Amino acid sequence: GQTGYRDNSMVIVSPDKQYVWDFYQTDVDGKKAKAIKKWDLSSDGIAQPWPSPYDITNPKVGNCRVTPVPLLSGLVTYAEVKAGHIEHALHFAYGGIEGGQPLGMNSSVYPCNTSNSGIYDNQWSPWLGHRFQLDPTLDINDTSTTGPWGGALSAGEKIIAKALQEYGMIYVENSGPRDLSIYIENVEFDATRSWS
């Protein structure tokens, strides 16, 4: 990865769409990573608990995020937004796992039933695996500055808001302090696609 702490995550999907490989702290040229995890897309997408402690330094074992779910699951893709709908829960990272008691099996819920014991839990943080839902009664078309959005949502924001109302979002990863991030496909290196 880059100097300093970065996830530098990467996902590769097999041409037959049967397998996906997650990469953690991938070098910019994509030739090296600190961890690699292969997932079978015909399974439930949830890793089994490890018989030994999580070891991020071993590229043959471990997950590429704090929780045992693939990077692809919960990802907002370019194709979904262009199609105008997202038909699954989103995954998000939050800066709530910092200080306090050691993170243990009792501070996560399914599907995040195992987690990295090297990170610490903030007493005010939700448990990994908790699902949050945007109030389905909120009007995503409200354009008033006094409404719930403080103005009009863009077309893409409406698609994400609708998915949050219908499916919610699941807490799967730690992020920086006071930071909340929804996972969205990076199209930076594809000149044919743009989020703008």
Where are the model-predicted features located?
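Extracellular low-complexity, O-glycosylation-prone Ser/Thr/Pro/Gly-rich "stalks"
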Residues: S181-S196
